[in-house]
């Protein structure tokens, strides 16, 4: 900055010197022509030249000032460049110093890594020894578990045979029940009854209608119980499926257990479907009895005969079934403790006794003698009311 001020002062001094020279020249010219009046025109020319000279001096002074300004700027830039060069040299020194430090650190790191590698190698050798010991121990454990699973598999085979025998027995009972139902339906179409009995059972019919509603409600509750048992069996089926993945060695035995669980689930679903169909049949028959007042006298007599015959046949057939089921339960009691879990759940569900609120019976809650009696009584009551009206 001081250098720039000095250059500006130098330029002003030169400008003043040039201006003074021009002034002297003008004075000389003016003195030469002062006494010559005839040369006024020439004096004007000189003045014009002086003016031109002054303008030229001003231009030169401005150009000189611009040049000095440029020189000052270049000098400043040169100083900046010198400073940057100094900074770069300092950075170069720092980089060389850092490079040396990095080399020292790299050598130290290499030595540390070599030491760690040696330690790691020793540790791997020790780990290899431990691994061999663990493998021998694992082999012994696998052999032991295999023997245990083999024993469990044999036990499951025995339980499966017992369960299969129980399932076949229940299937025979179910088939016998279905045959009995078909026989009742065939006998119902052929039997006849008396119309006068409707008047004698009027009071029974009044109470029986309410009993029918309670029996229907009990049937619905039984349906819910079957659905709950189905859900429990489904959960148990899922549990058996998850336990199947515990050991590859016991895969075959667990697969058989899973298949047995699926069969039990299908059986429960079939029982539920049958219960639903019977419940719908009861509701349909009840609805037909409600609409019985629209029948003719002949149709009323036929319907009354059918209902009474059905009630009688059902009572006899279901009494026989109750005796057979009691005998079957007595024969199956010693094997109850060894049955597998899936069949135990199904047996408990099928053997569970239920008491109807109207009669206190413990027979099949979906199609009982009491329910048939109620339906017959309700039909008779509807016919009698039609006659009285």
From Swiss-Prot:
Its main location: secreted. It holds the Pfam family YSIRK_signal. Residues 1-41 form the signal peptide. GO terms for cellular component: extracellular region. It comes from the Bacteria. It is found in: Secreted, Cell wall. D repeats lie at residues 305-310, 311-316, 319-324, 326-331. Coiled coil: none annotated. Keywords: Cell wall, Coiled coil, Peptidoglycan-anchor, Phagocytosis, Repeat, Secreted, Signal, Virulence. A- repeats lie at residues 89-99, 125-135. InterPro entries: LPXTG_anchor (IPR019931), M_anchor (IPR019950), M_repeat (IPR003345), SMCR (IPR049896), SMDRR (IPR049895), YSIRK_signal_dom (IPR005877). The keyword Cytoplasm does not apply. Residues 360-389 form a propeptide. Belongs to the M protein family. This protein is one of the different antigenic serotypes of protein M. Protein M is closely associated with virulence of the bacterium and can render the organism resistant to phagocytosis. NCBIfam families: LPXTG_anchor (TIGR01167), YSIRK_signal (TIGR01168). This is M protein, serotype 49. It comes from Streptococcus pyogenes serotype M49. The gene is emm49.
């Amino acid at each position: 900055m001081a250098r720039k001020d000095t250059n500006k002062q130098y330029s002003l001094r030169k400008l003043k010197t040039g201006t003074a020279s021009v002034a002297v020249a003008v004075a000389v010219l003016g003195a030469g022509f002062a006494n010559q009046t005839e040369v006024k025109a020439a004096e004007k020319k000189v003045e014009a030249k002086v003016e031109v000279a002054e303008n030229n001096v001003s231009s030169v002074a401005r150009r000189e000032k611009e040049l000095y300004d440029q020189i000052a700027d270049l000098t400043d830039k040169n100083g900046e460049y010198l400073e940057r060069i100094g900074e770069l040299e300092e950075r170069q020194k720092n980089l060389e110093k850092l490079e040396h430090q990095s080399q020292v650190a790299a050598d130290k790191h290499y030595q540390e890594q070599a030491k760690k590698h040696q330690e790691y190698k020793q540790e791997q050798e020790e780990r290899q020894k431990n691994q061999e010991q663990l493998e021998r121990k694992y082999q012994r454990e696998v052999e032991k578990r295999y023997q245990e699973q083999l024993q469990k598999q044999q036990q499951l085979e025995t339980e499966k045979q017992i369960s299969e025998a129980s399932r076949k027995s229940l299937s025979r009972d179910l088939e016998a029940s279905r045959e009995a139902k078909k026989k009742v339906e065939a006998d119902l179409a052929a039997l006849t009854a008396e119309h006068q009995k409707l008047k004698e059972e009027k009071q029974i019919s009044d109470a029986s209608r309410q009993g029918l509603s309670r029996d229907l409600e009990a049937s619905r509750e039984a349906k819910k119980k079957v659905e709950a048992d189905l859900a429990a069996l489904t959960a148990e089926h899922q549990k058996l499926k998850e336990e199947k993945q515990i050991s590859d060695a016991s895969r075959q035995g667990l697969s058989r257990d899973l298949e047995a669980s699926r069969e039990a689930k299908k059986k429960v679903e079939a029982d539920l479907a049958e219960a639903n169909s019977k419940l719908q049949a009861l509701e349909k028959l009840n609805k037909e009895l409600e609409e019985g007042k629209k029948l003719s006298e002949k149709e009323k007599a036929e319907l009354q005969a059918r209902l009474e015959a059905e009630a009688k046949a059902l009572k006899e057939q279901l009494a026989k079934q109750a005796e057979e089921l009691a005998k079957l339960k007595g024969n199956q009691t010693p094997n109850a403790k060894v049955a597998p879990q899936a069949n135990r759940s199904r047996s408990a569900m099928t053997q569970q006794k239920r008491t109807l609120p109207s009669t206190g019976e413990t027979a099949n809650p979906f199609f009982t003698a009491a329910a048939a009696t109620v339906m017959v009584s309700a039909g008779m009551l509807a016919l009698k009311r039609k006659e009285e009206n």
